[in-house]
Amino acid sequence: SFFLSVISIRPLGTPISSLMAWLEILKDKQVDDDILKEIDKDISRLNTITERFSKIGSQPELYPENLYQQLSNIMDYLKTRISRKIEITCNFSPEQELYIPLSASLFSWVIENLVRNSVDSIENNPGIISINVSESDKDVIIDVSDNGKGIPKSKQKTIFNPGYTTKKRGWGLGLSLSKRIVEYYHKGKLVLKSSDPKKLTIFRITLKK
């Protein structure tokens, strides 16, 4: 069950609080500022993960968020954590504005998961991951594409099933949970639009404005 994730994540709260206290102590010990900043980033990241999983067990509140700013923030975070051989491109700028109802923490997890899947598909080769946004009168479409190895046709109908994974480690919940977040919590759609190793693999998110 997805809700088991909530149970397993709750014990993180206490060690995170402890880490925050230790960080304050280290600040008084004249530890290098760069080290403290990295520790602070990691604690913030753990807090974000805890927040995301705590929302999965109940219907999260959706607030008007600038989609372009959200996507830009995610891209900035991921660019420093993936291979330099991989380029992340987009067809928008953070200065653009498009406000739609979102649970920002859960939505960012979906995009991160799709991008990380693209990174895995590209493997150690040079590659391009694109995040492109288009609009209609009522909907917003977000395409996440890559030029990696693609998904075999025999697997394309089951990729959203719990347990599907191409990794040696992991529970295979990524795409299944992403679909649940988009479709159950945001009332949108997440589909595999196409996958061709000679061209592109494209995942499409459709959200209401």
Task: Label every model-predicted segment.
Residues 5, 174, 178:
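Short alpha-helical Gxxx[C/S/T] motif in the catalytic ATP-binding
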Residues 182-183:
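Detector for a conserved hydrophobic position within an alpha-helical segment of the HATPase_c
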Residues 186-195:
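Glycine-rich ATP-binding loops of the HATPase_c
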Residues 146:
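Acidic ATP/Mg2+-coordinating residue in the GHKL
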Residues 151-162:
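Short conserved segment of the HATPase_c
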Residues 87-98:
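Conserved catalytic submotifs in the C-terminal HATPase_c
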Residues 128-138:
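Short beta-strand/loop element within the Bergerat-fold HATPase_c
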Residues 18, 33-85:
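Conserved DHp (HisKA) dimerization/phosphotransfer helix of two-component histidine kinases, i.e.
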